[in-house]
Amino acid sequence: MGIRSYRPYTPGTREASVSDFAEITKTEPEKSLTTYKHSRQGRNNRGVITSRHRGGGHKRLYRIVDFRRDKHNIPAKVAAIEYDPNRNARIALLFYKDGEKRYILAPAGITVGTMVVSGENAPFEVGNALPLARIPLGTDVHNIELTPGKGGQMVRAAGGSAQVVAKEGDYVTLRLPSKEVRMVRKECYATIGRVGNVEDRNIKLGKAGRTRHLGQRPHVRGSVMNPVDHPHGGGEGRAPIGRSGPVTPWGKPALGAKTRNKKKQSSKLIVRRRTR
């Protein structure tokens, strides 16, 4: 992909940029692989806001993406590379030899006509899914399972990749994009290569309207609120927090405080915690 920058014709286009969508080969989604997903606007089943700063945005059709890659030993041809409004990565439409169609995350470098396959004996090529035990050290992988057969849960964002750094016993050690080093069962599947749309991180939205179009609402600072609304609020003018450290609207430590449950069973699989 490439990025197209705007000239400062208006304040909204100054410093703004957009993807050129050069890799997109099909504009309409596959109807059999789409479904309508009602926007929750950050509310739970009682209508209470549980995730702030969400709402509005353009309506979306959800694309059913195959994260399991459980159609083993059946080759598939990449029929199209498509845009997916539900994620920053592109998706690839696969036509399997037996006639089935599926979407997968489009790896970087994959093109229309490429053949991909999943399985224990799949060739070592970009887009193929194999158990971690079969993947050589130093390989970049994405869409990684945490539980065998559950489907990929890690490294699915645009441009993301993890690296296989060690193998010992029943576990394979991975270095994740967050710099966390973690062990995963060797039976878990992962896809060779990194996720496509690598330049997405360099796109600048340029104005508030584009952010609202994505379904994100304003993120108001607590220091400009009233004391009734936030622990940071109140005071005359630009007042300091008035506490030993920043907190959330509900009084919990924020901005750097570790929130992971120390009793979580999977903590023993983390060799080195993430740095940020």
Curated annotation (Swiss-Prot):
Cellular component terms (Gene Ontology): large ribosomal subunit
SUPFAM superfamilies for this protein: Nucleic acid-binding proteins, Translation proteins SH3-like domain
Example of a GO MF term: transferase activity
Biological process terms in GO annotation: translation
Keyword terms, alphabetized: Ribonucleoprotein, Ribosomal protein, RNA-binding, rRNA-binding
Region (Disordered): 29-55, 219-276
Residue stretches of biased makeup (Basic residues): 259-276
Function (record text): One of the primary rRNA binding proteins. Required for association of the 30S and 50S subunits to form the 70S ribosome, for tRNA binding and peptide bond formation. It has been suggested to have peptidyltransferase activity; this is somewhat controversial. Makes several contacts with the 16S rRNA in the 70S ribosome.
Protein name as it appears in the record: Large ribosomal subunit protein uL2
Organism: Rippkaea orientalis (strain PCC 8801 / RF-1)
Protein's gene: rplB
